[in-house]
Amino acid sequence: MDQPLPTHELIERLRAGLSSDGRKVQVGLDVATSLRVPGALSGPLAGASFIAGVAGAVALSDSPYPRPGAQPADVRRYFRGSPGAARVSVVGQLVSATSLAWFTASVAKLAEQSERGSRGLRATAVSGGVLAAASLATSALCAAALTGSRGEQDASAAALHRLMFAAGGPVHSAGFGVLVGALGLAGLRTGELPRPLAIAGLVSATAGLLSSLYFVTDHGVWFIPAGRFSGLLVSGVAGVLLARRFRTS
């Protein structure tokens, strides 16, 4: 017949069991914390708000959007003739810029989980995100100014339109490309994103960076929409996946 264990031995075994269970719980909490990517859903919000603003402006406008280098009369016709349409686009851009700033924190958090080069990758993500958000906001404010008295004079209208396109076009695309590239690389290193999506992010980043060629040749303008819309798609899908991963962790 088995002898009952002494009381002190029972107490020691109970303590050991509780300690082991506590360590398991702590490990689980650490894993959940490491997978936390705050504000990940700001990725799809950045794309949705930008596209909604553009679509709303197109639907409400009475004249075509002035292309880069357009005559001041064409700029006035759009911004002064359809100020409501232009302001819809402005709101969409400002919401998108705010969302990008928030999403930058998510990408930086993901970059911190990389095993190697995490500090450099995080700094790259923050730099690209800040440039992308600031340049898009600058472009939106220029567009808003064009709907007011600043858009009435040829000289000021032309200058604002040039600044608006430069900030919201090649400058924004380059910064956004850096951010999306950091997202793709962090996704590859951590395994938090599907490999095809992470590689798509790197390809999109290349297009975004090449948009800077617009300052050298007009042919570089084609890289702007290529980098922007592919980047919005990648960041949107990645944001949904990262948010879902956090909820199930």
PLM segments and residue spans:
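Hydrophobic, aromatic-enriched alpha-helical segments typical of multi-pass transmembrane helices
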Residues: 2-249
